[in-house]
């Protein structure tokens, strides 16, 4: 069984730690925190070894009564691979430390593709990361795009994609971000970064995206228009998405007409933190007009890319060469539909 270090135990890191702990071929070597907050205390209560990201702050953990097992460098000595879930831009700075330690590393979508050199999605380009030293799991939004566009491309080919990304203003825990009472083009230039990010894993796809921030914390929402290579009916698209794992069709007619109601449904699934790893697509929105497909989907930004981090671990360490075998193994352990 391989040991996985989680550098950064925040929104993504704590979810990746629990996902790794749920697998039968890997375990958590330890998790790291910069400060002795409630998340650090919960990590200890869950049985994870806790390490300090900033050595000078180790004394603060002791004063707070939170035991630590050493520094991040000590944690890396106990691990076969590290998942870097530190804030945007910090991961790229950590890359040199991982190189010096000779340890493979997986980064999150907040890091630039060029800084890491390779990006990852379980469905689109798993093979490219087999045996690699470093890879980057694409962002929550890009993961959402890939989850639905890849099966559509496999079914009938894609000429061109245009997508409007309606992004949440902040995560639920982020009290210092917004907007509170505005709609913000983010960025105000076209295209947004999401299209180029998708191209790092779906090579050659013709896509342009625009994005805006809105005053909500629950989910992102995508409005997607796809010019298709081959003619298909809307029902064929529905059937393909319905059979695609990590995607779910939801119906407004059944009370799932908004992101709020979708997250209420996620609560009913009984998962930790009410996570929704799957990408919900509104079935009523799926329509084909003159060879162009239209559909709407939502993305739970805190959790949708978490299973991809588990698959990336298997790819880098060559624990599983077949992407679908890894996907299904991860799904079973995490209860993903």
From Swiss-Prot:
<dbReference type="GO" id="GO:0051287">
    <property type="term" value="F:NAD binding"/>
</dbReference>
<keyword id="KW-0324">Glycolysis</keyword>
<feature type="binding site">
    <location>
        <begin position="11"/>
        <end position="12"/>
    </location>
    <ligand>
        <name>NAD(+)</name>
    </ligand>
</feature>
<comment type="pathway">
    <text>Carbohydrate degradation; glycolysis; pyruvate from D-glyceraldehyde 3-phosphate: step 1/5.</text>
</comment>
<dbReference type="GO" id="GO:0006096">
    <property type="term" value="P:glycolytic process"/>
</dbReference>
<dbReference type="InterPro" id="IPR006436">
    <property type="entry name" value="Glyceraldehyde-3-P_DH_2_arc"/>
</dbReference>
<dbReference type="InterPro" id="IPR020831">
    <property type="entry name" value="GlycerAld/Erythrose_P_DH"/>
</dbReference>
<keyword id="KW-0560">Oxidoreductase</keyword>
<comment type="subunit">
    <text>Homotetramer.</text>
</comment>
<keyword id="KW-0963">Cytoplasm</keyword>
<dbReference type="InterPro" id="IPR020829">
    <property type="entry name" value="GlycerAld_3-P_DH_cat"/>
</dbReference>
<dbReference type="GO" id="GO:0008839">
    <property type="term" value="F:4-hydroxy-tetrahydrodipicolinate reductase"/>
</dbReference>
<feature type="binding site">
    <location>
        <begin position="194"/>
        <end position="195"/>
    </location>
    <ligand>
        <name>D-glyceraldehyde 3-phosphate</name>
    </ligand>
</feature>
<comment type="similarity">
    <text>Belongs to the glyceraldehyde-3-phosphate dehydrogenase family.</text>
</comment>
<dbReference type="GO" id="GO:0005737">
    <property type="term" value="C:cytoplasm"/>
</dbReference>
<dbReference type="GO" id="GO:0047100">
    <property type="term" value="F:glyceraldehyde-3-phosphate dehydrogenase (NADP+) (phosphorylating) activity"/>
</dbReference>
<keyword id="KW-0521">NADP</keyword>
<dbReference type="GO" id="GO:0009089">
    <property type="term" value="P:lysine biosynthetic process via diaminopimelate"/>
</dbReference>
<dbReference type="InterPro" id="IPR020828">
    <property type="entry name" value="GlycerAld_3-P_DH_NAD(P)-bd"/>
</dbReference>
<feature type="binding site">
    <location>
        <begin position="139"/>
        <end position="141"/>
    </location>
    <ligand>
        <name>D-glyceraldehyde 3-phosphate</name>
    </ligand>
</feature>
<feature type="binding site">
    <location>
        <position position="110"/>
    </location>
    <ligand>
        <name>NAD(+)</name>
    </ligand>
</feature>
<feature type="active site" description="Nucleophile">
    <location>
        <position position="140"/>
    </location>
</feature>
<keyword id="KW-0520">NAD</keyword>
<dbReference type="GO" id="GO:0050661">
    <property type="term" value="F:NADP binding"/>
</dbReference>
<dbReference type="Pfam" id="PF01113">
    <property type="entry name" value="DapB_N"/>
</dbReference>
<dbReference type="InterPro" id="IPR020830">
    <property type="entry name" value="GlycerAld_3-P_DH_AS"/>
</dbReference>
<dbReference type="Pfam" id="PF02800">
    <property type="entry name" value="Gp_dh_C"/>
</dbReference>
<feature type="binding site">
    <location>
        <position position="168"/>
    </location>
    <ligand>
        <name>NAD(+)</name>
    </ligand>
</feature>
<dbReference type="InterPro" id="IPR000846">
    <property type="entry name" value="DapB_N"/>
</dbReference>
<dbReference type="GO" id="GO:0004365">
    <property type="term" value="F:glyceraldehyde-3-phosphate dehydrogenase (NAD+) (phosphorylating) activity"/>
</dbReference>
<feature type="binding site">
    <location>
        <position position="301"/>
    </location>
    <ligand>
        <name>NAD(+)</name>
    </ligand>
</feature>
<dbReference type="InterPro" id="IPR036291">
    <property type="entry name" value="NAD(P)-bd_dom_sf"/>
</dbReference>
<protein>
    <recommendedName>
        <fullName>Glyceraldehyde-3-phosphate dehydrogenase</fullName>
        <ecNumber>1.2.1.59</ecNumber>
    </recommendedName>
</protein>
């Amino acid at each position: 069984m391989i040991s996985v270090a989680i550098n950064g135990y925040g929104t993504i890191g704590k979810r990746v730690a629990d996902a790794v702990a749920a697998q039968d071929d890997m375990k958590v070597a330890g998790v790291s925190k910069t400060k002795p907050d409630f998340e650090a205390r919960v990590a200890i209560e869950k049985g994870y070894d806790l390490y300090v990201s900033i050595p000078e702050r180790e004394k603060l953990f002791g004063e707070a009564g939170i035991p630590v097992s050493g520094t991040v460098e000590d944690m890396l000595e106990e691990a076969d691979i590290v998942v870097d879930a530190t804030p945007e831009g910090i991961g790229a700075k950590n890359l040199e430390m991982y190189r010096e330690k000779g340890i493979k590393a997986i980064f999150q979508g907040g890091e630039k593709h060029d800084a890491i050199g390779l990006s990852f999605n379980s469905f689109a380009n798993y093979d490219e990361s087999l045996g690699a030293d470093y890879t980057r799991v694409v962002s929550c939004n890009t993961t959402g795009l890939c989850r639905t566009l890849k099966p559509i491309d496999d079914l009938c080919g894609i000429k061109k994609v245009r997508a409007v990304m309606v992004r949440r203003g902040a995560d639920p825990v982020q009290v210092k971000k917004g907007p509170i009472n505005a709609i913000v083009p983010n960025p105000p230039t076209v295209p947004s970064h999401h299209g180029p990010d998708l191209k790092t894993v779906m090579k050659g796809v013709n896509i342009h995206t625009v994005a805006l921030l809105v005053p909500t914390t629950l989910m992102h929402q995508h409005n997607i228009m796809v010019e298709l290579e081959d003619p298909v009916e809307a029902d064929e698209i529905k059937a393909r998405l319905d059979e695609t794992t990590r995607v779910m069709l939801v119906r407004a007619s059944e009370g799932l007409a908004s992101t709020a109601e979708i997250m209420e449904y996620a609560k009913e699934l009984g998962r930790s933190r009410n996570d929704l790893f799957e990408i919900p697509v509104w079935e009523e929105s799926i329509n084909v007009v003159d060879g162009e497909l239209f559909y709407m989907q939502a993305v739970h930004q805190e959790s949708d890319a978490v299973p991809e981090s588990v698959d990336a671990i298997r790819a880098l360490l060559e624990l599983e060469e077949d992407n679908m075998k890894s996907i299904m193994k991860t799904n079973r352990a995490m209860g993903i539909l």
